[in-house]
């Protein structure tokens, strides 16, 4: 199975909990026996994986909304993981693989005033769209499990 993992947010960022989670997930995936394709921005700071894809330096808005989804479509993985930031909104068009975002918390819903511009207008809409999809799936599965009792 071909699995891509978005590690583009690692470039130029301080390593906090979400970044460390993404690195740990990536390293665990390497032991899975699957073809793992890490996607980096500017450089691979983690290892010498020959399957790594490096997106050249660009504006973060352009990277997260156009270049990343174009790169993923070109790779055509069966699964793509987003362990740090949500997937680009346009990824749903023309991509046949499965998309798995990571929800670290929902503080962005309650504390919107504390968010910077990028978080308000990039993260929040993307996370809400993904969360809405996941909630529909969860409710459907919950109802299905209740009906089978």
Predicted regions, residues:
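Carbohydrate transferase catalytic cores enriched for Leloir-type hexosyltransferases
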Residues: 1-149
């Amino acid at each position: 199975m071909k699995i891509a993992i978005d590690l583009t947010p690692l470039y130029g960022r301080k390593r906090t909990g979400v970044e460390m989670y993404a690195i740990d997930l990536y390293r665990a995936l390497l032991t899975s026996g699957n073809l793992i394709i890490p996607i980096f921005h500017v450089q691979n700071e983690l290892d010498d994986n020959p399957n790594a894809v490096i997106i050249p330096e660009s504006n973060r808005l352009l990277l997260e909304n156009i270049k990343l989804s174009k790169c993923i479509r070109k790779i055509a993985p069966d699964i793509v993981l987003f362990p740090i930031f949500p997937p680009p909104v346009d990824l749903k068009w023309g991509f046949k693989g499965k998309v798995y975002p990571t929800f670290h918390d929902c503080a962005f819903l309650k504390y919107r005033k504390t968010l910077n511009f990028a978080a308000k207008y990039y993260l929040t809409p993307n996370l809400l769209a993904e969360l809405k999809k996941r909630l529909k799936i969860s409710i459907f599965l919950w109802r299905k499990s209740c009906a089978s009792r």
